[in-house]
């Protein structure tokens, strides 16, 4: 930690951000937006006392059971994901229900990406996110993940 003489603010160095913890979050029955905002706090490192905006201080997050996330109200029927294929008349629309059946990890990824900063640092922090369909996270046992209840 480096302490400046003229302020009381403590600034973390990039070398201090090397020890990264990993967390496992179960998305079963969780609301999409509330889950996403908690995950973004962990990815950016805002849950730490030594948070510094310009340093990648965040931890890694593994989200399991992505297909069991839900939305409140009528959004389940109204929410539409749009993408462009690159061709003329190539705008495609996929309803939430179809996207949940095909690519449940994309739903959470899309929500979290919208909350992250659109900078090089934000892209680097976003790479610490893993979203899994189902509840098996054995491939991440070597990181010794901590199970979080959000």
Curated annotation (Swiss-Prot):
Keyword hit for Ribosomal protein: yes
CDD domains: Ribosomal_L13
Pfam family, one: Ribosomal_L13
Swiss-Prot/TrEMBL GO biological process terms: negative regulation of translation; translation
GO cellular component, one term: cytosolic large ribosomal subunit
Transmembrane spans: none
Keyword Transmembrane helix: no
Keyword annotations: Ribonucleoprotein, Ribosomal protein
GO molecular function, one term: structural constituent of ribosome
InterPro entries noted in UniProt: Ribosomal_uL13, Ribosomal_uL13_bac-type, Ribosomal_uL13_sf
Domain of life: Bacteria
Family stated for the protein in its record: Belongs to the universal ribosomal protein uL13 family.
PANTHER family per record: LARGE RIBOSOMAL SUBUNIT PROTEIN UL13M, RIBOSOMAL PROTEIN L13
NCBIfam families: rplM_bact (TIGR01066)
Assembly, per entry: Part of the 50S ribosomal subunit.
General function of this protein: This protein is one of the early assembly proteins of the 50S ribosomal subunit, although it is not seen to bind rRNA by itself. It is important during the early stages of 50S assembly.
Protein name: Large ribosomal subunit protein uL13
Gene name of the encoded protein: rplM
